[in-house]
Amino acid sequence: MPRERQKRGRRAEAKRKRDDEVGDRTAPKRQKASEGDNDFNPLHSQAKIGDDYIPLEEEPASSMDTPFYGLLDPDEQEYFSHASGLLELNQFETEEEKSIFIERVYEEADGKELKIACSQSCSRLMEKLISASTVSQIKSLFNKFVGQFLNLVQHRFASHCCESLFLRAAPYVTLEMKKNSAEKNDNECEDSSANLRLEDLFLAVLSELEGNWGYLLTERFASHTIRVLLLILAGEQLDNPSKATVIASRKKENLDKPKVTQRDKSASDRRAVPPSFNAALEKMMNDLVTGLDNTYLRALATHPVGNPVLQVLLSVELTHLGKSKARDPDSVFRRLVPDENLEEGSESAAFIKGLFYDPVGSRLLETMVQLAPGKFFKTFYKALVLERIGSLSRNEIAGHVVARILERLSKEDLKSSMDLILPEVLSLVKRSRFTVIKTLIERGVIRGVDLRPLADSLLLAFGTDPIARINNVLKLHHLNEENDDTKRSSKNSTPEQLHGSLLAQTMLKAPGPLSELIQSSLLAVTLETLIAIAKDPVASHVLQDALTLPTSTIQFRRQITSRFSGKMAELALDSSGSHVVDAVWSATENLIFIKQRFAEELLANERPLRDSFVGRAVWKNWSMDLYKRRRGHWIAVAKGLESVNPSNSENRQPPKSNLDLARARFAEKSNTSTPKKISATF
């Protein structure tokens, strides 16, 4: 007969009490080590926390409240892991073969979708399947998740599957709107789930999560899902790079998503959404903040989990619900900042001042600065920023907010702000905090502000010696230590090197003394230092911009390119230096003799270049095969007179001589004259 669990419970209770006593004695030491971030001793925390306290991690829910969907058996786990590997390799011969494989995986996963989504090893497979699924497959999977979303969005692994499902289904909602309601025949799947509308499925998700928004707002995993739903309902372009950090955290791996380097033109357009989404969006936003008082709402601004959700709420409110929404007393914006005048000592002014220096809250303040109505921004700038912009720019955190403020200033305000920031340039350079300086240069070029005072301040800060100046900007002493034929990577570079390189690139884009500061330094450094810059993955971008930007004169390009003589093959075989060699091609467009000399140097090293991956790219970009076989055509291409494409060169007509032009005029005159009638004799 089994024993009762009561006796074991008493032992566990006694042990728990002993552990608590030991914990109480060692609590001060733990607090000192962790600085009180993870100390949940109620006796110690009671005196510090207030009504606006939001714990970072709630106590885990009881196992009885969290449903368990079961585990995959070893054979199933092995099969799905193998399928995940095949999808990762993506070595299918045709798209039809891939679609058949995905259909087979779905058949094998029938009835096990929830197990796979909650599996640590197989949830990645679910994400990959979703990214390659058809509309009918998306609807079928969506329908099987309905009723379980409240639990799935809070799960560590299943929450990522939910996000992928929502992001994949969002574009099809727009397509469904454009289709005729009579078109219901789906050749891919005749299941009843194929006739479901994704619009209704999304509304079912909102209905399922309704009533739990207050808790999900600060839930570690569900908060990401809330952001995705808000953006989908608002019709935002989900492939916009600016939304990448809002949708997912920096730690999330982008599975099967192409990297977007620049913003697409279509990204600025809103997706068409059904009218029910607009109503659902307003209701969801109201439900998210209705039960929260102003104190709790402001506490979310500095909460690591709640802050990104608050950013999305604020951006959607100010961009999709109209600027007039900001005047509504019940709006998120007005509840955060109820005072319009922002007088000194007011509650709103104190709240905003605190956000300037908070590493989490400053991100919300950046969103407010970017999207706030013009009237509020002018009041905010004059009341809280104008007199303090110099001291704010010195701070590492507040400097990012200052950069956003500079982006909205007019020419006159930008000039006055620059005058207040100039005394702090020396301090900013010593601390390698170039964000404000970089933004000043960018906005000064756009607004047409005279940047010579800033150039003089940078000259004093970096040094009048051109060699020492480029060393201070790019931190070249680190390059000298690493210049030992060792593999370098941009991941190994320090933040100071990266920010210095970005500042130098920005200075090169400004015509006048700012670009001359960098150009003169590049001409003054030794050849070894110049080659080290060209081979560095971070600093080489400065050299590429110096060679290709319109601010570089032909005299500078002639002087800088001639220094690479004898080093072209060495640079062409380097992963970073090869990009500099490509930039030399563009820089020598009007310097054909220098370009020919470099081509001869590359031709002499043909075998090493062809054996190297980056070398083959340089060989192709310099059209060296054309240089070997058709030297005259290569010269025309080098001058920009002809295209490299042989088909274009064959269709190209050579210029007509004066004799050919005279013959053409005579032939045209003969055709326009009245033809003679010739009588035919029979």
UniProtKB/Swiss-Prot annotation:
Q: Which Pfam families is this protein grouped with? A: PUF_NOP9
Where does this protein chiefly localize? nucleus
The record's listing under InterPro entries reads: ARM-like, ARM-type_fold, NOP9, Pumilio_RNA-bd_rpt
Sorted alphabetically, the Gene Ontology cellular component annotations on this record are: 90S preribosome; nucleolus; preribosome, small subunit precursor
Which regions are flagged for Basic and acidic residues bias? 16-35, 250-272
A biological process (GO) of this protein is: endonucleolytic cleavage in 5'-ETS of tricistronic rRNA transcript (SSU-rRNA, 5.8S rRNA, LSU-rRNA)
**UniProt keyword Repeat present:** yes
Q: Where in the cell is it found?
A: Nucleus, Nucleolus
The question of whether Transmembrane is a record keyword is answered with no
Q: Where is this region: Disordered?
A: 1-46, 249-272
Repeat region (Pumilio), residues: 108-143, 347-382, 383-419, 524-562, 563-600
Per the record, where are the segments of Basic residues compositional bias? 1-15
Which cysteines in this chain are paired by disulphide bridges?
A: none
What GO molecular function annotations does the UniProt record carry, in alphabetical order? RNA binding
What keywords appear on the UniProt entry?
Answer: Nucleus, Repeat, Ribosome biogenesis, rRNA processing
What is stated as this protein's family in its record?
Belongs to the NOP9 family.
What functional role does this protein have?
RNA-binding nucleolar protein required for pre-rRNA processing. Involved in production of 18S rRNA and assembly of small ribosomal subunit.
The molecule here is called Nucleolar protein 9
Report which gene this protein is encoded by.
NOP9
